């Protein structure tokens, strides 16, 4: 996978920012399934143990003593089409699953009609695996990660796009730029220190890492970002926040807009 291309064109549908959460799991004896959804990179804490054994930054099940395999079911915060999957086994070495697969469905009318979007694949220890979805034209709101037979996975990302047609917009003023309303980054000049996608986050920044930051410009010109709105609308005002940016905020900014009848991605 071309990681730079994927980051520019797809969002992580497994992000807790979108409201994604763990629905159920077969086991989480050594590590909580909720750690799969963490935004931060996995870490390793030397010599740290909890009541069940070595603390690991990921979802880890106990050793399987019966037939079958472990799984975790995840409810996506917003429905979307899945193009790629990232299964990260960072720091799981000797306790990673031997194989993994992913199923997905669009849950409605109290029915889970699962389809396979990633066939059974071999997993390596301490490795970030990238896989292409086998069903990238269907909309899903639930996924199931299957691991064979047991073990630990640090992070799971499902990269794709929200299905804007299924989003519910309020009959009042709302943030047209929010990622929760289907907006996405189309292109930007630079994002050396902070991703442009952070501009679309629906919450107040916690620190400088939650913003868009470019490297220092040494030549002529200026930095820019192009954002595609999830829904057309009339813009009444802008809120431009530079919280936590003290010696590295822009001196000026400007905003332009246009209406396109073409599907720009």
Which positions does each model-derived feature cover?
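A cross-kingdom feature marking solvent-exposed beta-strand/loop segments within repeated
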Residues: 54-74, 82-91, 95-145, 209-227, ...
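Eukaryotic regulatory low-complexity N-terminal regions enriched in Ser/Thr, Pro, acidic
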Residues: 133-137, 153-159
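Disordered, acidic Ser/Thr/Pro-rich linker "stalks" and the adjacent N-terminal cap
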Residues: 1-71, 75, 159-230, 246-248
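Short beta-strand-plus-loop segments that form exposed binding edges in beta-rich domains
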Residues: 144-152
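Flexible, active-site-proximal loop/turn residues at the rims of small-molecule/cofactor binding pockets
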Residues: 91, 149, 162, 244
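Mid-sequence acidic-hydrophobic segments that form the walls
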Residues: 105, 148, 159
